[in-house]
Amino acid sequence: MKSLAPWFGSVVLTLLISPASAQQYTDLLKDGSLSQWMLANGDDVTKGWQIEKDGSLHLAGRGDNLLSREDFGDFDLWFEWKISAKGNSGIKYRVMKYGNSWLGLEYQIQDDSAFPKMSAEHYTASIYDLFDKSAEIFSRSYRGLDEYSVGRVIVQRHRIRHWMNGKLIIDERDDSQRFADAVKDSKFRGQQGFGANHSGKLMLTDHGSEVWYRNVFIRRLDGCALVP
C-alpha cells in the first residue's frame, strides 16, 4: 500500500499489510489498473477516470459510473477519498439493475460545507437518501478538501455500518422496520425490493464532480464470523 491515513493505527495497519491477512483483501486498484472495473454496458474504462502517478484514481471529466466486474455479498471495504469544492459523488454497493438503472445502497461523498440546507441523509457517510446518523452520539470528523479522508463500509448479513475518519456514522439493519420505512420515504420507494438483495456490484458514481480515490481494498465476509 502506498499510504494509509494516520488514524488507522498500528493494529489495522499491521492487519492490512501482514502476509497472512493481505491475502484476504483484494486491491481494487491493483497495479495501477482499472481491470477490475467496467462501464455499465460492460465496456472497459477509456475516458474520464484515470490512474494518476501517485496511484490514485481520479475522475477529472465525465466518465460515467464505474461498476466492479465482480459481485460482492458480505464484505469489509476500506478506501480513501477526496472531493472537489461543491462536489458530489459516492460509492454504491450491492448494486443491481432496476429497469434501465443500476441502483444500490450508497456511502455518500460530498462537500457538505457547500450544502448547508441539504437534507441530513445526504451528508457524507450517510446511507444516501435513507439515513443520516444512527445515533446522536455519532459525529463526523471532517478534513480539508485538499486532504484525503478515510471511509469504511462493513456489510454483513443484515447489518450495515459506515465509518468516516475512524468514527462510526451508520449502524443499521436492512431487515428492520426502520429500514423499510426509510425506503418508503425515499426516492427509491418505487423500486420493488430496493436494498433487500444481499449481493451485487460496487459502483463509483459520476455526478459530474472531480473526485479522487486511493487504497481501495475489500475483504469478503461471506460465511465469516460476525465482525465486531
Predicted segments, located by residue:
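Bacterial N-terminal signal peptides
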Residues: 7-16
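Positively charged n-region of N-terminal signal peptides that target proteins for export
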Residues: 1-6
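Carbohydrate-interacting regions of secretory-pathway proteins
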Residues: 22-228
